[in-house]
């Protein structure tokens, strides 16, 4: 029995050594690249498993799971830096890992998240040490003039995405690029919009998209949420959407939306004023732009959260009140 256990342990050790040897061999083999040089962008706050997937998706012939094993085995799993990397023919998994651990980026990245406010975007850009901060201390209106935009209020006008830049680049160029990207995406979506929508301009559609962005709990519900608000606009009903009220409260909002807040009139209070608010309330992504301009075919006028991130939609107030009692108050 003891002899059998010794053989079993020896076999297990041999298997581990063989696997380790296989990883070491693989780590030194050149990988295939879809182009050379190949620019690969690793997003900020990526896990080691996500880095392997981003490499593979970018056209690097690595096995994501093996790359993760290699990173952990070499103690580099938590040392990989975000940014743009230039990979050339002959690169191996080990050389790529070393490059990322040392942060040998050709470009740096700033990621702007869907649903952020302009204030949040400016805070992240201002905190990026690799940028030249030419807009620091500027008012929003001055920033818009600096990038050559005709608008004075920047809210919603910058496309949320991951942007590459070289060290020492001016933040003016980043803002200009994000602004131009939003203009292009918005105009492209406007050109493909559904018929008979209650928007007079692309800017109104952008405002609606920002509301959809803030109201959406599950991605698949965007077009239904858009349908509710579009239907209410058509009927001249109050939109009654909490995110606009919160935006209108500004710095005075403490995280708890009260009844008196819903009754306090501001230009953004859609419980007291009909129509859309005067500006967007956030930076909407492409999916929200498309939903605003191509809402689902539905007669729904109401929705309420089910408490799990999804929503219950209703076409009349009676059904809506029943849904509110069920999902918000726990009543049958």
Residue positions per predicted region:
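Intrinsic disorder/low-structure terminal segments
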Residues: 1-3, 66, 178, 312
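Short low-complexity stretches enriched in small and charged residues
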Residues: 6-10, 37, 77-79, 116-120, ...
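N-terminal type II signal-anchor transmembrane helix
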Residues: 1-37
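Residue-level detector of flexible, active-site-proximal loop/helix-junction positions
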Residues: 15, 91, 275
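Signal peptide-directed extracytoplasmic domains
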Residues: 23-186
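Intrinsically disordered, low-complexity sequence elements enriched in Ser/Thr/Gly/Pro
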Residues: 4-5, 51, 304
């Amino acid at each position: 029995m003891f002899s059998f256990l010794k053989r079993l342990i020896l076999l297990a050790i041999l298997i581990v050594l063989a696997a380790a040897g296989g990883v070491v061999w693989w780590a030194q083999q050149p990988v295939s690249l879809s182009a050379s040089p190949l620019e690969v962008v690793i997003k900020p706050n990526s896990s080691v498993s996500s880095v392997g997937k981003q490499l593979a998706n970018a056209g690097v012939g690595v096995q994501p799971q093996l790359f993760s094993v290699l990173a952990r085995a070499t103690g580099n799993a938590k040392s990989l830096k975000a940014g743009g990397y230039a990979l050339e023919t002959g690169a191996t998994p080990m050389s790529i890992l070393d490059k990322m651990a040392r942060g040998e980026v050709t470009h740096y990245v700033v990621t702007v998240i869907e649903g952020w406010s302009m204030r949040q975007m400016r805070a992240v850009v201002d905190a990026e040490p690799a940028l030249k901060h030419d807009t620091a201390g500027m008012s929003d209106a001055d920033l818009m003039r600096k990038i050559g935009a005709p608008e004075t209020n920047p809210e919603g006008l910058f496309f949320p995405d991951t942007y590459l830049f070289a060290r020492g680049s001016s933040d003016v160029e980043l803002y200009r690029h994000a602004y131009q990207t939003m203009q292009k995406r918005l105009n492209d979506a406007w050109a493909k919009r559904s018929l008979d929508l209650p928007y007079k301009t692309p800017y109104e559609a952008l405002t609606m998209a920002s509301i959809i962005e803030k109201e959406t709990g599950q991605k698949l519900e965007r077009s239904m949420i858009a349908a509710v608000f579009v239907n209410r606009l058509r009927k001249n009903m109050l939109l009654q959407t909490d995110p606009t009220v919160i935006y209108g409260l500004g710095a005075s909002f403490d995280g708890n939306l009260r009844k008196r807040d819903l009754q306090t009139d501001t230009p953004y209070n859609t419980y007291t004023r009909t129509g859309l608010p005067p500006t967007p309330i956030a930076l909407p992504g492409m999916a929200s732009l498309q939903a605003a301009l191509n809402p689902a075919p539905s007669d729904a006028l109401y929705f309420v959260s089910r408490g799990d991130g999804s929503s219950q939609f209703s076409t009349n107030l009676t059904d809506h009140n029943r849904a509110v009692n069920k999902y918000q108050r726990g009543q049958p």
